[in-house]
Amino acid sequence: MARFVAVALLVLLSLSGLETIQHAPKIQVYSRHPAENGKPNFLNCYVSGFHPSDIEVDLLKNGKKIEKVEHSDLSFSKDWSFYLLYYTEFTPNEKDEYACRVSHVTFSTPKTVKWDRNM
């Protein structure tokens, strides 16, 4: 029993140190299918490799927050960093600009990554 308590305490102590680790998120913005003007598609913002888990992600159209956005559950990798996918249906055209804005403790100000229709 004492051995179990010692091992459990060691595990808890090692995990408690994870909160002090900070990793900036990697942000990727892309469409599900190649962009075609006037053809419905999905805009994706994949945010990965970040720690701690507190994060705010917004998809933007012409600099304004898109309200109807869905996202995956918060998940973590083998290295205990987190990842998320935010997505929404959209219809690309030549005049509108789309982006993903991320706020995280590792950024002094929110970081915005624009969607490149040629990627």
Curated annotation (Swiss-Prot):
GO biological process, one term: immune response
All residue ranges annotated as the Ig-like C1-type domain in the record: 25-114
Disulfide bonds: 45-100
Record SMART domains: IGc1
Keywords of this entry: Disulfide bond, Immunity, Immunoglobulin domain, MHC I, Secreted, Signal
Record-level GO cellular component terms: extracellular region; MHC class I protein complex
PROSITE patterns: IG_LIKE, IG_MHC
Keyword check for Secreted: yes
UniProt keyword Transmembrane helix, yes or no: no
Principal location: secreted
CDD domains with a match to the protein in the record: IgC1_beta2m (cd05770)
Domain of life of the source: Eukaryota
Localization per record: Secreted
Signal peptide: 1-20
InterPro entries: B2Microglobulin, Ig-like_dom, Ig-like_dom_sf, Ig-like_fold, Ig/MHC_CS, Ig_C1-set, MHC/Immunoglobulin
PANTHER family referenced in this protein's UniProt entry, alphabetically: BETA-2-MICROGLOBULIN, MHC CLASS II-RELATED
Family to which this protein belongs: Belongs to the beta-2-microglobulin family.
Function statement: Component of the class I major histocompatibility complex (MHC). Involved in the presentation of peptide antigens to the immune system.
Identification of the protein by name: Beta-2-microglobulin
Provenance organism: Callicebus personatus personatus
